[in-house]
């Protein structure tokens, strides 16, 4: 019998599936097992050298104390400049700097979602959207894009049927985790029309904005007419700049929202790490070439994987951005993933964790050699074509 009485809200939430698989892979590796880890959403590149130097310089200059809670002025202004370049009308006062993108999402949900409030998700959806909704006391309505190859445009009628005047928040993620699709302007305009018609606030998670394939350009939802005052834009430094462990993210929206969210921020994390924020300024201002090189490498891997899977009898929708691929697997995707890691020693994440059973998410943030090794192992255990 437990000594503790846990809250209902925590009881509604399951541990992160992505972190659970990552921990299992690490445990096997500690026993000497060679695991090809395709579960983790982490670039396999090092942080750009100039960003690391900026952090060192900030440390040497004594930038180790508290900062203003919303972030240092230089970083907030650099973020605002980036957002304005994306077509959003934001000043530095509209920006909250957070220790990671998850914290940004948490603060927004805690500020906007109360007991019983409705949040609409577009499946497959990143695992933490559901958890953040439940932690805030909200309820979920979900729209599945799987029948449309994970493209939102085909699912707009379904989304229209799901979103109503009772929908308090709609979450849009493009390029998407776990599917890698980049939503078209027509799809985003459809979201805009629904949001305006139902007076619904939209969270636009743009964490993978700079990792797009085939020369695509991603439209920021908040730049569309009618969306500036009803969109909260989330972004961060983990993926594009290979800064996962630095824990630096941000959100931007109407000043009133940022001010209210500041209460959650101030009473939970106080501020993001001082010297890391200075490194963030350097990342925004002087890493275009490094970011482009990483994005190009991800695109080459995408091309190799999609072609290799086709050669082995598996057709998959080609990801348009980010660095994830949804592989069709057995109906019981969780059992498939357990077999994959337990027998083939390949770590993946079950699609059911994202609201899409029958699939496994593979991250191609790994070397081409290791990715092909993973396919060989899965094929040797009759797992690669299990969902065909």
Task: Name each region found by the language model.
Residues 3-6, 14-16, 21, 28-35, ...:
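PLP-dependent class I/II
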Residues 10:
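Substrate/cofactor-recognition hotspot
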Residues 34-41, 57-62:
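Glycine-/proline-rich flexible loop or hinge segments
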Residues 47-66, 80:
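Glycine-rich phosphate-binding segment of PLP-dependent enzymes
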Residues 63, 74, 350:
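Short coil/turn motifs at helix boundaries and re-entrant loops, enriched in small/polar
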Residues 67-71:
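Short beta-strand to alpha-helix junction loop
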Residues 75-79:
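Conserved AMP-binding/adenylate-forming core of the ANL superfamily
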């Amino acid at each position: 019998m437990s000594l503790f009485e846990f809250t209902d809200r925590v009881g509604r939430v399951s541990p992160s599936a992505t972190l659970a698989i990552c921990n299992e892979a690490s445990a096997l590796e500690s026993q000497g097992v060679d695991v090809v880890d395709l579960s983790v959403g982490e670039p396999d590149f090092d942080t750009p050298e100039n960003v690391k130097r900026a952090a060192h310089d900030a440390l040497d200059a004594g930038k180790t104390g508290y900062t203003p809670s919303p972030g240092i002025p230089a970083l907030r202004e650099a973020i605002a400049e980036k957002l304005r370049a994306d077509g959003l009308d934001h000043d530095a006062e509209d920006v909250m700097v957070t220790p990671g993108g998850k914290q940004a999402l948490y603060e927004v949900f805690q500020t906007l979602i109360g007991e019983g409030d409705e949040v609409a998700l577009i499946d497959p959806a990143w695992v933490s959207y559901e958890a953040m909704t439940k932690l805030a006391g909200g309820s979920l309505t979900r729209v599945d894009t799987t029948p449309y190859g994970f493209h939102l445009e085909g699912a707009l009628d379904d989304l229209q049927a799901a979103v109503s005047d009772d929908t308090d928040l709609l979450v849009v993620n493009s390029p998407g985790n776990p599917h890698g699709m980049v939503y078209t302007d027509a799809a985003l305009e459809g979201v805009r029309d629904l949001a305006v018609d139902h007076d619904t606030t939209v969270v636009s998670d743009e964490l993978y904005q700079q990792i797009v394939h085939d020369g695509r350009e991603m439209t920021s939802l908040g730049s569309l007419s009618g969306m500036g005052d009803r969109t909260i834009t989330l972004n961060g430094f983990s993926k594009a700049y290979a800064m996962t462990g630095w824990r630096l993210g941000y959100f931007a929206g109407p000043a009133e929202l940022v001010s209210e969210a500041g209460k959650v921020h101030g009473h939970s994390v106080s501020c993001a790490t001082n010297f890391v924020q200075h490194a963030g300024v350097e990342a925004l201002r002087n890493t275009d070439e490094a970011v482009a090189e990483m994005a190009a490498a991800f695109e080459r891997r995408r091309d190799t994987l999609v072609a290799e899977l086709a050669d082995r009898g598996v057709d998959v929708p080609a990801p348009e951005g980010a660095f994830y691929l949804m592989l069709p697997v057995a109906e019981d995707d969780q059992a498939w993933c357990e077999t994959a890691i337990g027998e083939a020693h390949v770590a993946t994440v079950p699609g059911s964790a994202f609201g899409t059973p029958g699939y496994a998410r593979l991250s191609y943030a790994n070397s081409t050699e290791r990715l092909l090794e993973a396919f060989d192992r899965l094929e040797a255990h009759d797992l690669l074509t299990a969902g065909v």
